[in-house]
């Protein structure tokens, strides 16, 4: 069983006298920095000078400085910029200031797990990862609650790395719901697998394939969109709130019978074999290498795929129907 920490299990002792530098001020950076500051922790923000994020962070009341200045002043450096830019920023602007006993922290284990960032041996390496978009991290904190999260320790140089990570998690508001202790490997590999096979890859391809099947059979694209895409939210919300069994209990008997008797013909043994192959590519580093080469080349394949997605009929039909439903503005 996993270890779960709650508010009662965690104190601020390991972080209350430390300076925490949040590097980056996107959705997660802003939410985590504000929550920790409002929890009484000493937070500074490291950014590129004079950009939109710089001005926003100042307006939010933070002490804002360059990444180099923040890395030098901080005891804990919490990196919340995109995965693909982290290695270059780390090497040039953070690594020179990683003196003995400091902690380098992440919200995703990708670059540490695959070795794109290799901190010196005399620092802690930790992870504090909210399992929610940044906007919800902030909103629920302001409401007096929070979202669930993860903590992990890749290296405990000072002997209190876990307490440091947990103190940050408490400051962000995660321990009010519960924080699961994991590892950099487990977080990285399960996160990538979920994105590729279900959340971003599998679901979107299933939607498109079903939409195309109906349109090719002569059904109106608008009807196809409603039945294969628009109504998905209703089912996902039920699963989110009640679990799979709760979803089955809240759909019609016809939908339940049809789903239970036909689903294995859609997700079959070939599908499961493909899932295992994708997981293996994640585990052995092939995906990470492929993605690294794609970045270095300037994202040619990704940009081509983006163009194809934008040109698909489902996008044109969906845009019009979302406008009709008041979900998308002109």
UniProtKB/Swiss-Prot annotation:
Mg(2+) 2 binds at residues 191, 227, 231. The active site is at residue 108. Its cofactor is Mg(2+). It catalyses: (2R)-2,3-dihydroxy-3-methylbutanoate + NADP(+) = (2S)-2-acetolactate + NADPH + H(+); (2R,3R)-2,3-dihydroxy-3-methylpentanoate + NADP(+) = (S)-2-ethyl-2-hydroxy-3-oxobutanoate + NADPH + H(+). GO terms for molecular function: ketol-acid reductoisomerase activity; magnesium ion binding; NADP binding. GO terms for biological process: isoleucine biosynthetic process; L-valine biosynthetic process. Keywords: Amino-acid biosynthesis, Branched-chain amino acid biosynthesis, Magnesium, Metal-binding, NADP, Oxidoreductase. NCBIfam families: ilvC, PRK05479.1, PRK13403.1. This is Ketol-acid reductoisomerase (NADP(+)). The gene is ilvC.
């Amino acid at each position: 069983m996993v270890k779960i920490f709650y508010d009662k299990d965690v104190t601020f002792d390991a972080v209350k006298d430390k300076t925490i530098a949040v590097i980056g001020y996107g959705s997660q950076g802003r939410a985590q920095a504000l929550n920790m500051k409002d929890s009484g922790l000493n937070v500074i923000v490291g950014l590129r000078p004079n950009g939109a994020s710089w001005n926003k962070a100042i307006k939010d009341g933070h002490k804002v400085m360059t990444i180099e200045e923040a890395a030098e002043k901080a005891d804990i450096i919490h990196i919340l910029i995109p995965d693909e830019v982290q290695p270059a920023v780390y090497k040039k602007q953070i690594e020179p200031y990683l003196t003995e006993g400091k902690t380098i922290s992440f919200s995703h284990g990708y670059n540490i797990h695959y070795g794109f960032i290799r901190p010196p041996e005399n620092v802690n390496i930790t992870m504090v990862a909210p399992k929610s978009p940044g906007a919800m991290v902030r909103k629920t904190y302001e409401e007096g609650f929070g979202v669930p999260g993860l903590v992990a320790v890749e290296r405990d140089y000072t002997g209190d790395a876990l307490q440091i990570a947990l103190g940050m998690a408490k400051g962000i508001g995660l321990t009010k719901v519960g924080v699961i202790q994991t590892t950099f490997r487990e977080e990285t590999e399960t996160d990538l697998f979920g994105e590729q096979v279900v959340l971003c890859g599998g679901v979107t391809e299933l939607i498109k394939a079903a939409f195309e099947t109906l349109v090719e059979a002569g059904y109106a694209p608008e009807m196809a969109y409603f039945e294969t895409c628009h109504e998905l939210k209703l089912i996902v919300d039920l699963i989110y709130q009640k679990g799979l069994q709760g979803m089955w209990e809240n759909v019609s008997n016809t939908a339940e019978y049809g789903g239970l008797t036909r689903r294995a013909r859609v997700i079959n043994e070939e599908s499961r074999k493909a899932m295992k192959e994708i997981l293996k590519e994640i585990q052995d580093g092939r995906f990470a290498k492929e993605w690294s080469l794609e970045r270095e080349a300037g994202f040619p394949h990704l940009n081509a795929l983006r163009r194809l997605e934008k040109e698909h009929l489902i996008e044109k039909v969906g845009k019009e129907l979302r406008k009709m439903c008041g979900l998308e503005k002109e």
